[in-house]
């Protein structure tokens, strides 16, 4: 059983574009907002907290779209569809986030991790 749990959120705007964040660490990949669960935190709670920490949005989690295993970290990643209830504009709100923006499937930036593409397919 994997020791770590992670969660991410697929947040779409009114045109169906997905919110992506660019991290300041690692390979500077574009990714879905999300991260590692804290002790005794559910995957859904993790997704909500990480979105708030990374881009300043309070979101509602609607449904689980997929669970993906990352053997490099022995971690399960839970990916949820979430909504931006207040229609607020996302802004980087953590030093670990360089940039955030909504991107259509046809305009996904590079380099990009696997999770945004998988999440959009969910």
Label each PLM-derived region with a short phrase:
Residues 13-53:
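Conserved Nudix-box catalytic region and its N-terminal flanking loop in Nudix hydrolases
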Residues 69-91, 101-108, 116-122:
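Active-site-adjacent beta-strand/loop module that shapes the phosphate/pyrophosphate-binding cleft
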Residues 31, 58, 102:
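Short aromatic/basic micro-patch
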Residues 57-66:
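A short coil-to-beta-strand element that immediately follows conserved catalytic motifs
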Residues 3, 28, 60, 74-76:
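Residue-level preference for beta-strand/loop junctions
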Residues 37, 108-109:
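A generic structural signal for short hydrophobic patches within well-formed alpha-helices
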Residues 11-12, 20, 82, 102:
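Conserved hydrophobic "DFG−1" position in protein kinase catalytic cores
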Residues 1-18:
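Conserved N-terminal beta-strand and adjoining loop/helix that marks the start
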């Amino acid at each position: 059983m994997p020791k770590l749990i992670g969660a991410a959120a697929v947040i779409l705007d009114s045109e169906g574009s997905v919110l992506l964040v660019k991290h300041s660490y690692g390979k500077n990949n574009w990714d879905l907002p999300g991260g590692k669960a804290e002790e005794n935190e559910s995957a859904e709670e993790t997704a909500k907290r990480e979105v708030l920490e990374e881009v300043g949005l309070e979101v509602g989690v609607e449904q689980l779209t997929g669970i993906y295993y990352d053997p490099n970290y022995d971690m399960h990643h839970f990916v949820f569809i979430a909504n931006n209830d207040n229609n607020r504009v996302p802004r980087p709100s953590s030093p670990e986030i360089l940039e955030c923006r909504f991107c259509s499937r046809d305009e996904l930036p590079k380099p990009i991790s696997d999770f945004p593409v998988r999440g959009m397919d969910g």
